[in-house]
Amino acid sequence: KVPVIVAWSPYGKSTGNAPKYNAIFDMLGMDPSKVSGLMKFEGPDPAFWCAHGYAVCNPDPRGAFNSEGDILVWSRQEGKDYHDLIEWLAAQDWCSGKVGTSGNSYLAISQWFVAAEQPPHLAAIAPWEGMSDIYRDLVARGGIPDFGFPHMLSRSFVGKNLREDLAAEGEQHPLVNALWESKIPEFEKITVPAYVVASYSNSIHTPGTFRGWRRMGSSEKWLRIHNNMEWPDYYEEANLADLRRFFDHYLKGEQNGWEETPKVRYALMDMAGNDQIGVPADAFPPSDFEMTKLYLDAESRSLSPTSATGTTASYDGAAADGAATFFFKVDTPTQFVGYPKLHIWVEADGNDDIDLFVFLQKLNADGQPLEQITVPNNGPVMQGITKAGASILNYKGSNGRLRASMRHLDDAHSSDEIPAHSFDKIEKLAPGEVVALDIDMFPVGLILYPGEQLRLIVTGHNIVGGAMPMVENVQTCNHGRHIIHTGGDRASYLQLPVKSTK
C-alpha cells in the first residue's frame, strides 16, 4: 500500500505537456526533459513520485471535462468536494490511508479550502504559490476592479455544463459580500502540516500565499521563499527532493530530520546576479529586523527617518507620466526583509476618488532601476515581452494599490505591520478633503549596498502592466490631480523591516 498525492484543478488529468503548455514552457526557457508529460498542468509528475513510492491522483473536479455538474471556482463547496475525494482515496485497498496534496496556482489555492475542511486522512499539504482570497487577490485587489486575468482564466475551464464567471460576478458584486466571503478559506481550521512556497514577484499569487501561511492554524508549517517563477521552481530537482523529505516524513512516517528544517527560508535579492537563497530564519520578517519608518518629504523628494515640515506634491492622476517619487540612499549594507506598508495622506482635485498605485524599486549606485527576469530565458525576447506587461515574469520591485473610497480598515485582520481592508463600504472624497490611506505592499527581501537607493513611486496607474502576456492592464477611475501631503500633522511614511550591517 502507498500514500497518494492529489493534484486538484479543472485543467485536465494529464495535459502537462499539451502543445499550448509546451509552447509556453519553451518560451520561458524551461527544460522539457525535466518532466515526463504524465502530470496535469502545474501538478506533481507521476514519473517522479510513483518511482519513490507514491500514487498520484489527477481528478477532474465538479463540472470539469466529463465530471457532472457546473464548474465552481475556488469556494468552500470545492473544499467539500475535495474532502470527499480524499476520504474515498484513503479507503481504497491500494492506499496506505495517508493523503497529501501538491501543486501550484489553482492546485495550491484548492489546498487552502480542503485543508480547512479537515478531512481525517489528509496528512500534509504543499501549496506552491496560490491566492487565498479571490476578491482581494484577483478580482478587485485594493478595491480596484481588475478583470483581465479572470477573463483569461475562464477560457481555461472546459466542461459539459456551466462554468462560474468571476469577472461577471465582480461587476455584479463590487463590494465584499457573502459570495466573496465564501471564496476565503477558514484559515484557522487549517491545522494539518504544511510546506508553503512563496515568492516576492508573483503578481497574482504573492499576497495570498503569504496570507495563507500567516493565518493558517497549523503549528507545523514551513515557509520557503524563492527568487524566481513558480513553474521552474516547482520542478527543480533540489526542490523536489526537499518536498519529498516533507512528504516522506508526514505520509510515510520516516524519521528523516524534516522537523529540524528552519521554519522560514527566504531569498535575499541583490538584483544583480548575487541573490542569497535559503537564508534561515525563525519568522518572517526575521526577529532581528527592526520595523522602521521612512518619512516622505514632498519638497526634497526624499525618504528620511525624521519627518519634515508640511508640504505637498501633485501630479495628473490620468497621465501616463504622472507620478511623485521619493528616494532613500544607504551608506552601509542594508537589508530590507518583510512587509512594507505605505501610510500616505492624499487629496483629489477634480474628482471624488483616487486609484493609487505605489511601487518600491531598487536603484543601483548609478541610479538605474534594477529588475530581474524570473524564468530561465532572460534574453531579448523575454525582455521585450516584459517591458510593459507580463509582470509575473519580470520582478521590478514591490507594489501596492488602493482605491481611496475603499480605504476602510478591517479591524479583525489589520495589524500595524499589514493593513487589511473591509471593502464593504464606499467612502467618496469631498472637495478639499484630505484622507490617510494605509496600503499593504508585496513583501520584500532586498539588500542594498553603499550608494544604492530605494525609490518609492506614487502614481495613478499600474506601471508594471498586466500579470501575464496578453492580459490587459487595470483600468482606473482617475482624472484630475492627485495631491500628496507630507510632513507636519500629515506625515506620510513608508514602513518596512530593516537591518544594517557592516
Model-predicted segments: where are they?
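Active-site-proximal cap/loop segments of hydrolase catalytic domains
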Residues: 1-259, 263
